[in-house]
């Protein structure tokens, strides 16, 4: 830095000396020119005097004019040079002042930097001293802590690590629980969406199958011919078909009563043919019953084939198709089993499509899930066991066999399709109008449901809705708070499970409402 200041000072001195020397040189040149001009003028004058005395005055004037011009020009040039030199001197002075100020600033900065460096050095020494003191104190504290706790440093580290691991394990468990709960919630939501979509897309009938059939007669005189002499005709018909004929005051009608729909259909077909033919006697009755039995067997096969065609299911064994057709004449709680099986197959296929599963396999499993009901009155065992035996005998797919075995929860479901079939079975059976119960039983169940709910303290009103599948309980807010509302719901649910028989599930909803009313006057 000192070298730069010295160099700038020398440069300024050299510039000033050069300016002065230039000025002196220019002044000497100007004076030389003036002297030369004067000498030339004198020479001219002398020459003029010698050459022409006549024009002496004019020559003298001309010379004087020339001398005056030369002098004027020389003086002007001198003034310009002098002004220029003065300007250069002024600029040099300004630059010198600027350099002086910069030099002072640099000196001040250098002095400030020196002070700061000295201060930083001092602080660094202080920090180093403090670090050494802190390290000494920490070492003493560590020794004291080890003495008090009875743990060495490594042992304490292991204890802390174990505590941290335990805490992290707890937090991880909570996180996993939260994620699992969220996953279940999302799965339930998705399941509800799939079930809702399947139900909306499924158009099913409201069935009401009965255990009696009615045969219309052309007139009441036909009743006597059906009974026959000493009742031989009616006895023959009842013996051959196993169906009771009820002939009462109902005009122009005979009622066929029996719990086997196939036998009832055979009796109905045979009786209609006898009435149409008009020849009614035991031999003719036996002939018509045999013919009706063959026709019903053929109709059963056609029902099975038509069902598989409508559902788009191929490759079923012919015997299995015939057994499937028998479901047309079977009912469960008033619901036609074949229609129920078709409905289950359709629902299972819709839900399988939503989940990306095999739709045809799901429909096949749904259609055959109740196949055992076709012959459960002829073979020992539950319809589930019989269905599994039939499916195994006719070499059905393992998924179909598992769906039949698990649709009532008797066996664990090993595939998604089995779970879908069970869900579709519950949907088909639980939908409004699918199955029938007596009005008296239904009303008694609803009354019992409301009675159980109203037996608890704090209950204000109780409403059984959705055909007894939900009960809504209004409680008194000044007696039952939010915490007791949850407990009340659990207690009512437990009592319903203990005292009431019901199909499916019953939803218990406890509603606590607080109203604040004021009047503006």
UniProtKB/Swiss-Prot annotation:
PROSITE patterns: HD, KH_TYPE_1. The lineage of its organism: Bacteria, Bacillati, Bacillota, Bacilli, Bacillales. One of its GO terms (molecular function) is RNA binding. Its main location: membrane. Residues 105-124 are annotated as: Disordered. SMART domains: HDc (SM00471), KH (SM00322). The keyword RNA-binding applies. Its EC number is 3.1.-.-. GO terms for cellular component: plasma membrane. It holds the Pfam family KH_1. CDD domains: HDc, KH-I_RNaseY. InterPro entries: HD/PDEase_dom, HD_domain, HDIG_dom, KH_dom, KH_dom_type_1, KH_dom_type_1_sf, Ribonuclease_Y, RNase_Y_N. It is an enzyme of class 3 (hydrolase). It comes from the Bacteria. It is found in: Cell membrane. It is a single-pass membrane protein. The keyword Transmembrane helix applies. This is Ribonuclease Y. GO terms for biological process: mRNA catabolic process. Keywords: Cell membrane, Endonuclease, Hydrolase, Membrane, Nuclease, RNA-binding, Transmembrane, Transmembrane helix. Residues 211-274 form the KH domain.
